[in-house]
Amino acid sequence: MNRPANRFFLKPISLAVVAGLLAPVTPAFAQSDEDEVIEEVVATGTRLKGTATAVMEERKNQAFVADIMGAEQISRTGDSDAASALRRVTGLTLVDGKFIYVRGLGERYSSTQLNGSIVPSPDPTRNVIPLDLFPSDIIESLSVQKSYSPSMPASFGGGNVDIRLKSIPSEMIFNLSANLGYNTENSGDVLDYQGGGRDWFGEDDGTRAAPVAIQDRWESKQFLDNLDPEEALDLFSQVKRDYGPLEESADPDMGLNMTVGNSFDYNDDWRFGFLATAGYDSETRASEQYELQDPDRIGDDITLVRYFDDIRGTERTVKWSSLLTLGIDYNRQHQIDYSIIALNDTRDEIREKFGNTENLSLSEGVRIRDIDVEYEERTLYTNQIKGMHTFPELNFMGFDWRWSEGRSIRNAPGNMEARFVIADDNEDGFYDPATEGSLLDAQTAARYSFQTLHDRLENYGYNFTLPYTMGKWETEFKFGADFVSKARTAENRRFDVNTLGFENREFLEGSIFGDIFSDENLAGAELNNRPVLRDTTIAGDDYVAAQKVDAYYFEADFFFDNKWRFTGGVRWEDFRQVVAPLDPRTNQFDLNDEADRSQLAFQEDDFYPALAITYFLKDDMQLRASIGQTVVRPDLREVSSSTYIDPLTDFPIAGTPGLETTDIINYDLRWEWYREAGNNLSVGLFYKDMDAPIESVQSPAQDGPPLIRIANAETGEVYGVEVEFLQGLEVFGDGIWDNLFTSGNITVSDSEIVLDRQNIVDQTGVSAAITNTERRMTGHSEYVVNFQVGYDSDNGEHSASVVYNVFGERILIPGIDGFDDSFEQPFHSLDVVYKYYPDFNTTVTFKVQNILDEQKELTFEDTLLRSETKGTSFSLTYKYDF
């Protein structure tokens, strides 16, 4: 509801800041006699703390605890997407560059909305959407609500992230920008392979796809079982085999963006407008990595059994985005907007890995060499229409509604992995893959996999608001409904190359997969009675899932005597979900018995209340307290017994039928002080009490990476303190201090879960030799620090920011069999962003990221488990506003 006019008035300097941000500067106006005065206003507020003032006004008017980040703040930090930008928000950490952990709680404990609507996810293993899909260029602001309100989805743990896209401008805008970039890890030649003709656009042209003959067999449910040796060889000859690796120079990073929009007054009552944006970015990142898969303990010493100690990788990403918004406004009281959004993020990675296994090791005089190629396209299409209506004749009653339909696709048309063996034939201690290597002589010398996922989601809802004033009480009643329908289908096919099917295997010597299996070699190959292709698609590789939520809520907002604000209400949700693993060969449910079937279908309905109280200590100071009851439900695949590979960690994950929901009671207390010119300070406390928290546990694995199981702990809690500030440094004196400001936030927190070994065994049906039955939650960091120093020149031509971010160590893999938990180590991110404004139309941006050249590390008991270099990135952007 609208706050009383005398609640938090804008100081004169704040008004100047906002005016400088919003007022257009036409060429004629820029040449007027007041030119110097205008430039002085811009220098005073626009880039120093301008948008901070705007977003602070919104934040302090929220009934519940929330943090908001505006477009200019994102621009100052130089972050390229929503995921990177959100790590600057108090208490938020970024995991795998895609998922946000709010207050130390995993991605399943947060929810994401796009313009207030739920959107589908292209991730086959998670319900939540990867936030790196959303480029910064289309974002107007990011809102993170940390305390639950009944108007939000009840599936709320750490918080709710609402990505607000740019809307129709108040006047004509048209700008173009281009950027070039470079990373220090890309020096020299990098790994590469021959892809398709449309890789530049992030789209496979069919090069990687399974040949039509194999696809026809899969469609007809024949698969590749019991093939004749000649038929298997013929099918294999049609498969792409030219995967290198090659040595090529890396292309520079590049990007292009365009925005155009305008609004038109038809008459005094009607206004029309539009906004269109399009962007394209390509990036190449080479890296050096280390990967320990299987350690062993002998006494007090840890020995390495299966590991890759020399890994080179190259990852290419192509992102493109487009947004079109159309709007109509009548008399400033009725507004309807329609938006269509298309986003694409393609990742193409090749890795060359040298290492040892238990049977193939240096002690045996051999090394192994793996070639991995992973290619995936993630695409999101969304249509949204929303309306906002105010009825002055009905005591200014408000009504808003929205409808959204989204479709997300993950397409991995053809990934490949192959294993070579290198023998030290020359006995010189040097393992040369070109002269001493050969393809592994085994049933699985190479593996091809093909994956698709389609996620469709429809979300619609409405809200009514009715303000009412009586004496010293100002009241607003709000009620509404929210409906979500979601359907997902996923398919996975794979086959192995069986080199035991060749009678004469001398031609397997070499280091290039495509040369070994050249057309000439295959044509002259001698076969035995074993087919060279083995279909390794298994039951559970396919699954279908559906989800439906019907929700209604009521909320009331009371102001009393300009001193107190009471906001509370209740939400009722009816949640239904079903997940069914399928046998690809029969297209029938892959269920062992009726008990399994009943556990895969889940339904619950309940009430979720919340209450918030705000006390206004002064005109610019307030104290908030809130309590809310919420729930966190298992992800779609986590209630299926089938095993799948997490594409982000490469760990196998097994779901658990009968997994229970997590009930959470959330407590928040926050003191806020909003001062002139955007300066502010806030201190908050939070506590979350969880019953049956959903957690990751590790089970013993026979070979390869550890097997991760999803299970319920007994109890859990998270608590901590958050401090946030923004302060101009003019308090230290005149001169340069007038041009500087600092901002930042610190979160210090702790968490604890209690696990019961026997209960986990009963729930998962496997051994659970858990090392620590009481530990922190997976992914929780005990501290998160963000700090920024900003500079703006007196003439408004120069702007610079130094930005620092670090998170405390966090558990990634819980330990078993006496091994301690594995921790991802702190990553000290230090970036510099400099902007030059030679005139009112031009912006030149120079950005340096990861100045400290930090690398990602995962350790346990002072033993390195994984590492990956990141390099230092440089980029130069030119933007022109017409």
What are these regions (language model features)?
Residues 219-351, 379-383, 609-612:
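Transmembrane beta-barrel wall of Gram-negative outer-membrane proteins
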Residues 88-90, 117-146, 166, 192-193:
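Short acidic/polar hinge/loop motifs at secondary-structure boundaries
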